């Protein structure tokens, strides 16, 4: 059986910036930190909204959409996020309320409460479950950022099958900035159901507001990704393509708007 990266009550990194770096993003501090590592929200300086779309396997029924709204208040930011995957007969939704706070110039902490809802057509019905997340970011030395994130700290169980727990996912990564022009990211991710996955990504700023990205990840199947981003006035648009050895290319697009 081929896994395509989604399952009920699962957690999945969001944003085309993350996708273009093979999701090596646990150390990033953009608005997508609301889904990837809530500690990164503590570095948000303006109210922002973001939308994301992924067309997996070029099949509408496997597409994923997400939206985030975040507001900073001094050294704290509050965000709400929503993710949807599936189609009318089967779909998954994730609602999240996140808080990220800088505890000092070089450290931040974030938490999130999630509600997962799964819909089955016919006699199978619906079910929901609550989960918790926690994340940490720190800068032990100049230009080096360390990120750690734990999904399902509550060890919640799946209501559709009480003998099964919602997967616990641990992520740890490093990001190193080179002369404010390039960032190298490395990350390891351990899902309680699977072997550890290792990821690496590169983001390069060749000129102005243009960013080029690439990344690779290991796992049961080798994958690689590439993408680009461009900022114009209050908007940032990111596009990425990830490649699965067997299933082919998946396009990703996201847009961020600075509100006030």
Q: Where do the PLM segments sit?
A:
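Subset of outer-membrane beta-barrel
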Residues: 2-260
């Amino acid at each position: 059986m081929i896994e395509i990266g989604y399952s009920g009550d699962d957690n999945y990194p969001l944003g085309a910036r993350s996708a273009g770096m093979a999701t090596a993003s646990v150390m990033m501090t953009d608005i997508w930190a609301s889904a990837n590592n809530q500690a990164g929200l503590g570095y948000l300086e303006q109210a922002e909204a973001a939308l994301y779309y992924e067309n997996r396997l070029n099949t509408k029924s496997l597409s994923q959409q997400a939206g985030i709204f975040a507001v900073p208040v001094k050294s704290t930011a509050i965000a709400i996020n929503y993710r949807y995957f599936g189609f009318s007969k089967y779909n998954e939704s994730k609602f999240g309320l996140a808080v990220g706070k800088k505890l000092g110039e070089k450290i931040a902490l974030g938490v999130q409460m999630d509600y997962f809802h799964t819909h089955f057509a016919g006699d199978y019905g619906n079910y929901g479950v609550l989960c918790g997340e926690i994340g940490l970011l720190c800068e032990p030395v100049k230009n080096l950022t360390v990120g750690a994130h734990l999904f399902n700290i509550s060890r919640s169980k799946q209501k559709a099958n009480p003998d099964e727990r919602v997967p616990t996912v641990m992520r740890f990564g490093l990001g190193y900035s080179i002369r404010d022009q390039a960032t190298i990211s490395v990350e390891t991710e351990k899902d309680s159901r699977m072997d550890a996955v290792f990821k690496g990504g590169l983001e390069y700023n060749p000129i102005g507001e243009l960013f080029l990205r690439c990344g690779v990840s290991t796992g049961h199947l080798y994958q690689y990704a590439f993408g680009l981003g461009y900022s114009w006035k209050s908007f940032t648009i990111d596009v990425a393509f990830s490649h699965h050895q067997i299933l082919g290319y998946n396009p990703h697009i996201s847009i961020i708007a600075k509100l006030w």
